[in-house]
């Protein structure tokens, strides 16, 4: 329930802060983690999609676990932990002062404006979530064909 999740993070205290992306995107919640490594200039954010996909950007393991534990309160039909672990993809990214791109499995995110940075991270997050979803669907189809 994405609406209840939004309300939870709106009333949440540190380290999690709900970040509005745009009124156009109602299928996602963005959370910024504020008390990670203070020397890091790269922000730590999480995109939570209404289909269950979760995309972490520069988030320490302990905070990932905290997010997953909070998600359990607001989710129906949770995916098994083994499935979540098997579908995990780790990609590298850097923040740059040019247009965002994907080159050789390295995501380059434009950090010249906070708004553009957030929208570009949303775009890449959505693409990654769809890629994982497509991969799961194809795997399921292969398994069905193998049973025939």
Model-assigned labels for residue ranges:
Residues 1-135:
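Short Lys/Arg-enriched alpha/beta "domain-start" segment
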């Amino acid at each position: 329930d994405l609406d209840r999740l939004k309300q939870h993070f709106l009333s949440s205290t540190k380290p999690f802060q709900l970040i509005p992306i745009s009124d156009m995107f109602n299928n996602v919640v963005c959370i910024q983690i504020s008390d990670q490594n203070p020397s890091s200039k790269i922000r730590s954010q999480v995109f939570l999609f209404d289909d269950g996909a979760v995309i972490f950007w520069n988030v320490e393991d302990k905070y990932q676990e905290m997010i997953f534990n909070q998600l359990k309160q607001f989710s129906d039909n949770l995916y098994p932990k083994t499935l979540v672990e098997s579908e995990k993809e780790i990609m590298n990214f850097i923040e740059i002062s040019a247009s965002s791109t994907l080159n050789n499995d390295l995501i380059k995110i434009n950090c010249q404006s906070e708004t553009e940075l957030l929208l570009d991270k949303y775009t890449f997050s959505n693409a990654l979530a769809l890629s994982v979803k497509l991969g799961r669907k194809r795997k399921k189809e292969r398994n069905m064909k193998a049973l025939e």
